[in-house]
Amino acid sequence: MGAPKTGNVRNVVLVGQGGVGKTSLAEAMLHLSGKTARLGGHDGTKPTLDYDPEEVKRAFSISTTIAPIDWKGARINVLDAPCYPDFIGDAFAAMSVCETALFVVDAEAGPQPTTVKLWYAAEDLRLARAVFVNRLSRPEASFATTMDLLQERFGTRLGAVTLPWGEGEDFDGIIDLVRMKARHCNGTEAVESEIPEEYRAQAEEAHDHLCELVAEADDELMMKYLEGEETLTQEELEGLLSKAIAERIFVPVFAGDCIKEQGVNSLMDDIATYFPAPTDYGEMPLIDGDSLKISSDDDRPVAFVFKTLADPQQGRISFIKVLTGTLEPGLELINARTRKSDRLAHLYVMCGRDMTEVGHAYAGDIIVAPKLAAETGDTLSITGKVEAAAFKFPNSQYRIAIEAENRGDEEKLYTFIEKACKADPTMSIDRDEETGQTIISAVGEAQVSVLLNRLEDRTKVVAKSVPIRIPYRETIRRTASAQGRHKKQTGGAGQYGDCWLRVEPLIGPDGTSDGYEFVDEVVGGRIPRSLIPAVDKGVQETMKDGIIAGYPLTGIRVAVYDGSYHLSLIHISEP
């Protein structure tokens, strides 16, 4: 598999609600392109993409995988992103390096909550968008209803580029509205024929609507079309289709069924022909507010690490998008964050778990490199002065305390999870200094469950979750005064001293009890100045264990305001 030129690259991320067939669509694309001999993940065939034991067990994707497909002169890098809520951070990372987000929608269920969330994320990233309406062979499938729901939710810029040839049990292929042909997948070959007469009127009406939508990409043609002066030629339609998709004027909607592999050939044809290349996308935002144009003409290589993976067999793997220039094995680049050098010893194209070594990678392409020190979100360049703006990961809202069943494994546990958190910024690990517990923060419970299963599988360390011990605090509600007295006689010189303390609530700006203040209000030398710090120290020592339940005391102001002592007995003199 050679390195594609920038203009031939199509980076497409598959997103949508979990369980709608995104991975199955990618597997169908691999099969129909000849990359795999059989349709992965179907009829007992092992999947190429969801290869992780946790993915196999749970039957959904938990990590982004890549399916590079050579089709009609284009390299289509399909990024199959997990969209289960706990792992959606990977989807955001994948979207940040693609030019097009392809939403897979179930023909029975329509657009669901995760689809909506990711739709607006793609809009914020200014990605081109497309929709594949899947599972049209199911009994309750309806392309028309799904189209209505999509347009109701996302607007009227969406338009069909293919229609279903039958639905439910009668679904037998698609009608291509650009080429005005019917297509049926027979094995891995798409058989083209004339549109059946019973679908002719529907197809012509949909074709006219498609022309009207994409004509908005050209003001002059739009006016002529609306005034009825002319219809769009095939050449004009195809040219406008590319422009309208790249400029986000139009969202193409495809009909199909990835298990039956119907409509997938046409989808790949249109991705290769009409979807934007990296140079059409524009510029990558930089951390300093500037931007970097993705270009093969710039001879200064810049690479962006959008994902890191700790593979038990292959070690640490960095997923990279080449932003400018050409990457080659042996190239030394500087990390903008650490200012340290990283050497690209080898470059690979990755398909699922399989890796194929390549001699170079051009701007716009997505490749992987092993054993880099770079972390997710890092930018590598010749000067180290270029730093891409980091994408925003979802907030970690789930916290749990864990501990090793064998107390001797605590350090091994912490080290493994710390490395996993560096690869996935949606997770973090911390050791609570007060309670001594190891705390994991993550997006959700399933994410932690996968992490602990991998910990046991790869290190044989068994960990369990335990309740987080809450670091309670004690405080006071009203002011009080008290006297403390010290008196000691040991046969020789005696010790005597007493002091009066006033303790009052200390309320912070937010209205909560917080902090500690010590005030010296002693006058007339009633207590020697040299002993005042000892009073403060004694108060703070007492605060550590609290008064009522043994929790630390906070939110108090303590004033020492009176006292007495016998100087001759305790041998103290004023400085």
Segments (PLM) and residue ranges:
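Structural and coupling elements of P-loop NTPases
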Residues: M1-S573
